[in-house]
């Protein structure tokens, strides 16, 4: 195939910057609202403070220059990284200064992790519970101790050094953010050079990042963990640098080290299989993945990403062009296919962000599930409070990211989308949006009525004493046969479809019970009718969330009801009376509604996880091998009715948080109570009439005028949108706080 001269042309990569584009001025920054002419004039009404918060980070509203917006985002990313390094440094510092890490390291099954000792001011020292080893403190459930163990950290001094390193990196990032905005700001074409960006992120960030971590794991983590696993005390283990410079020391633990790099260059790579393993399953000593497996995994990823980082065409005429790849995509029903997509993704950061948030959100939810099915760090599997916390945390993060994807998709549609440039291509999926939305709606109605209907049927039959007519494992069975089939093929894989694996990828699928310190780390998770029922509730709530978000961005520019919606903007309360309902139709309102359904989805998912694990996985193992689970396997019979969920999960397991007063867990009792109040407070904003408050304010202002203490800034009721924002924020904050206290008080007591 002949290549035209146009295709051979490559965009020469130039580092192009503007020198000193923006002055560094503390005087300017000290003025509230300096980024907006209107806000800089100062407050006339109380609405000013709301607009200040709403617009401070809305760079689109501050300038129409894409280059300037790009620079602000780029600079803000360095600020974000600085905060992350500061937070990391704080975590490591707490580990070094206030924790019982070294004691935990010598007895990880008998001592609980703690890195916070509460000062006695008026009796708060009650919160310092006995975590074992003579240490009194607040039990932490973050998983840091297990991560440090996997990294090969054995002393507080190492934690101190890392904390100082984190501070140095935070300062460097802060400087970089200032430098690349005020001293040398990249030009727009630098931000739009996607091939270079892909190559650098794939090869540098992911490829070299994985390679660096592999090196750390092989040279430091593996030998130190091998010695710890075999019972050597942390004090007797050689210092980390000795493993780096003393090959004999390494060769005692991993004989292939004595051969150096000869096997690598002679392609006898199998020689290295003593530290790059493919075992599968879990380390029976720690209940975590084999660290030699994870080193091998990261090495493989490094190779993949380093190769991927050489795929895109830059200064040399070889490799892919992103625009050509996209425009080659043409399906039978999508007209010009992906034509125009390259222009969208290089000129709309909202479109980019929407895709990235959806991907990262989904990835976070995948991480949540892998953390318990394949526990990656030593002793994390038997630390039930940490397992529950990490699952819940990653589910929440994922949910917020996915709703954020819907938000930025709508903002893209309203602010950045140009219909003239997107005729007859894939982006005109808005042409068949009615089919998409009505099908989703039908799916939601079907799933909702059928999944809920199965529970209602069971509740009714149980109330009538007709247990033989219920859907259950002992009466009318609804077994999840496809899930059970997936479990069985994974269990049978080692030696068959995965010929080199010694054990299954996860014992959740089947196989042995792995116990550490007489506690279950992981075991086969049997699925039955109760799981089948609740999985259809998951399907229902997830599809409703998707319906709201997808309808939101597909109709964010126009609809039959409001054809000129794009002119009204991303958020507006209503579009006047007289045409049916024109309130709650903006892109923003769909995000608002989507957040509630995201909360519904995740609550059911984390409740399902918490109860299922306590009922069917977590528990103690007797010397004879009998397992007694925390709630004695009650999930299969109790979780098949609404009443069972209310009585045997919510009510039965809330006893610990409700009765926590006067114990080390009493803070959770207070948080449980306070978070309920925060949640109830949200309802005042969600069921509110704006006019009611404005009338009330007028009366209060009249009274102030009467006694001549009227404020200079005129009080205003919250706008409808502001009220909804305050409402949903407190609803979610209250809900998350309540769940946090409920879960932790329970699992710290019984786990």
Curated annotation (Swiss-Prot):
Source species, domain of life: Eukaryota
Gene Ontology annotations for the cellular component aspect, listed alphabetically: chloroplast thylakoid membrane; photosystem I
EC number: 1.97.1.12
Residues that coordinate or bind phylloquinone: 693
Pfam families: PsaA_PsaB
Catalyzed reactions per annotation: reduced [plastocyanin] + hnu + oxidized [2Fe-2S]-[ferredoxin] = oxidized [plastocyanin] + reduced [2Fe-2S]-[ferredoxin]
List of residues binding [4Fe-4S] cluster: 574, 583
GO molecular function, one term: electron transfer activity
Binding site for chlorophyll a': 676
Record note on cofactor: P700 is a chlorophyll a/chlorophyll a' dimer, A0 is one or more chlorophyll a, A1 is one or both phylloquinones and FX is a shared 4Fe-4S iron-sulfur center.
Residues that coordinate or bind chlorophyll a: 684, 692
Transmembrane segment boundaries: 73-96, 159-182, 198-222, 294-312, 349-372, 388-414, 435-457, 532-550, 590-611, 665-687, 725-745
Residues making up the signal peptide according to the UniProt record: none
Subunit structure: The PsaA/B heterodimer binds the P700 chlorophyll special pair and subsequent electron acceptors. PSI consists of a core antenna complex that captures photons, and an electron transfer chain that converts photonic excitation into a charge separation. The eukaryotic PSI reaction center is composed of at least 11 subunits.
Protein name in UniProt: Photosystem I P700 chlorophyll a apoprotein A1
């Amino acid at each position: 195939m002949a290549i035209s001269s146009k295709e051979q042309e490559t965009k020469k990569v130039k580092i192009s910057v503007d020198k000193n584009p923006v002055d560094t001025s503390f005087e300017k920054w000290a003025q509230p609202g300096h980024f907006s002419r209107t806000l800089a004039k100062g407050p006339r009404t109380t609405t000013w403070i709301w607009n200040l918060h709403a617009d401070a980070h809305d760079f689109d509203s501050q300038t129409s220059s894409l280059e300037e917006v790009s620079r602000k985002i780029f600079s803000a990313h360095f600020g974000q990284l600085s905060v992350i390094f500061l937070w990391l440094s704080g975590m490591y510092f707490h580990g070094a200064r206030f924790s019982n890490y070294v004691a935990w390291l010598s007895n990880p099954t008998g001592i609980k992790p703690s890195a916070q000792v509460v000062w006695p001011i008026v009796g708060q020292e009650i919160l310092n519970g006995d975590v074992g080893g003579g240490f009194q403190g607040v039990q932490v459930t973050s998983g840091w101790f297990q991560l440090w163990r996997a990294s090969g950290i054995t002393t507080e001094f190492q934690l101190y050094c890392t904390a100082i390193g984190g501070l140095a990196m935070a300062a460097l990032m802060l400087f970089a953010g200032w430098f690349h905005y005020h001293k040398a700001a990249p030009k727009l074409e630098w931000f739009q050079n996607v091939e270079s960006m892909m190559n650098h992120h794939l090869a540098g960030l992911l490829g070299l990042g994985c390679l660096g971590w592999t090196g750390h794991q092989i040279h430091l983590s593996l030998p130190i963990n091998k010695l710890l696993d075999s019972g050597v005390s942390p004090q007797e283990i050689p210092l980390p640098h000795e493993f780096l410079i003393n090959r004999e020391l390494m060769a005692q633990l991993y004989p292939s080290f004595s051969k150096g790099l000869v096997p690598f260059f002679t392609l006898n790579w199998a020689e290295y299989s003593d530290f790059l393993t493919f075992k599968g399953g879990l380390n029976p000593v720690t209940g975590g993945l084999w660290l030699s497996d994870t080193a091998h995994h990261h090495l493989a990823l490094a190779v993949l990403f380093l190769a991927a980082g050489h795929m895109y065409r830059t200064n040399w005429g070889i490799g892919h062009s992103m625009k050509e790849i996209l425009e080659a995509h043409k399906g039978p029903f999508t007209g010009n296919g992906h034509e125009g997509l390259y222009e969208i993704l290089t000129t709309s950061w909202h479109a980019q962000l929407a895709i990235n948030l959806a991907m990262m959100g989904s990835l976070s939810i995948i991480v949540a599930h892998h953390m318990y099915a394949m526990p990656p760090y030593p002793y994390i599997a038997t630390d039930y409070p940490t397992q529950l916390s990490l699952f819940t945390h990653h589910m929440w993060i994922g949910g917020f990211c996915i709703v954020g994807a819907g938000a930025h998709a709508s903002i893209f549609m309203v602010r950045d989308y140009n219909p003239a440039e997107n005729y007859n291509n894939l982006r005109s999926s808005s042409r068949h949006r009615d089919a998409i939305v009505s099908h989703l709606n039908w799916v939601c109605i079907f799933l909702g009525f059928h999944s809920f209907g199965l529970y209602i049927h069971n509740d009714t039959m149980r109330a009538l004493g007709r247990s033989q007519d219920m859907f259950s494992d002992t009466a009318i069975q609804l077994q999840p046969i496809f899930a059970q089939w997936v479990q069985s093929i994974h269990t049978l894989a080692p030696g068959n479809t995965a010929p080199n694996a010694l054990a299954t990828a996860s014992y959740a699928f089947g196989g042995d019970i792995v116990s550490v310190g007489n506690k279950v780390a992981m075991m086969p998770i049997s699925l039955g009718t109760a799981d089948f029922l609740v999985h259809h509730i998951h399907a229902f709530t997830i599809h409703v969330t998707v319906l709201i978000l997808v309808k939101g961005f597909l109709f964010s520019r126009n609809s039959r009801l409001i054809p000129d919606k794009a002119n009204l903007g991303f958020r507006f309360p209503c579009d006047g009376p007289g045409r049916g309902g024109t309130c709650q139709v903006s892109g923003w309102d769909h995000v608002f509604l989507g957040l509630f359904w995201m909360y519904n989805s995740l609550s059911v998912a984390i409740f399902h996880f918490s109860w299922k694990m306590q009922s069917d996985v977590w528990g103690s193992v007797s010397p004879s091998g009998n397992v007694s689970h925390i709630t004695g396997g009650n999930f299969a019979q109790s979780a098949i009715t609404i009443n069972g969920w209310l009585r045997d999960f919510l009510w039965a397991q809330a006893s610990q948080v409700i009765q926590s007063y006067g114990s080390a867990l009493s803070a959770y009792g207070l948080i449980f109570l306070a978070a309920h109040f925060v949640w109830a407070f949200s309802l005042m904003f969600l069921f509110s009439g704006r006019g009611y408050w404005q009338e009330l304010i007028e009366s209060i202002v009249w009274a102030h005028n009467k006694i001549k203490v009227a404020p200079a800034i005129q009080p205003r009721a919250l706008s409808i949108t502001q009220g909804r924002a305050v409402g949903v924020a407190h609803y979610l904050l209250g809900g998350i706080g309540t769940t946090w206290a409920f879960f932790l008080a329970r699992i710290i007591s019984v786990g």
